[in-house]
A protein has these predicted regions:
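ATP-dependent carboxylate-amine ligase
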Residues: 1-167
């Protein structure tokens, strides 16, 4: 260990994998690519262990994909988070509100759950609702820099949206 400690200068994190965003705010913010129930469960379990405050999670599910995982995502998020912002991910040709309803129906009743199909405004609301000591996890897109909406692909990066709100 002593030999290695002198050799390791810095370890870069993988972009979009539990990536910390620090703009001087008094709460933690992480962006993660978690887009499966198991991945979301693991990320939120880790985030829960790092905060004594509220755990707030922003997430959605892709459209034109496995509809069966949507309720599982709602259950996984509700297992750890105090507040959920369920939003769009890459809705593709599906109605974002329909996807959101599929997720929300499985969120435990004791979890506060808000919805907003506009991902940018859901991220903004989650960040504005955070207090010192809280933790906000923005999940599902991670390193992605685009969002698929109907017949178009638009530039969209959770990290840039969050940083703009935090500055």
């Amino acid at each position: 260990v002593e030999k290695l400690s002198g050799e390791v200068v810095a370890v870069e994190s993988v972009p979009g994998r539990f990536e910390s965003l620090d703009e001087g705010q008094e709460f933690a913010v992480f962006v993660d690519y978690a887009h499966t129930p198991d991945a979301l469960d693991n990320v939120l379990k880790t985030a829960r262990s790092l905060t004594n405050g509220k755990l707030i999670c922003v997430f959605g599910c892709g459209g034109d994909r496995d509809r069966g995982k949507r309720p599982e995502m709602g259950r996984a998020a509700g297992k750890w988070a105090d507040l959920l912002w369920v939003t769009s991910d890459n809705p593709r040709s599906e109605d974002p509100d329909s996807i959101i309803k599929d997720i929300v129906k499985a969120v435990p009743a004791n979890v506060v759950c808000a919805t907003d199909a506009n991902r940018a405004s859901a991220i903004e609301a989650a960040l504005h609702g955070a207090s010192p000591g809280d933790c906000v996890v923005i999940a599902g897109k991670g390193h992605e820099v685009e969002q698929e909406l109907n017949d178009r692909v638009i530039p969209f990066d959770d990290r840039l949206v969050a940083r703009a709100v935090l500055q």
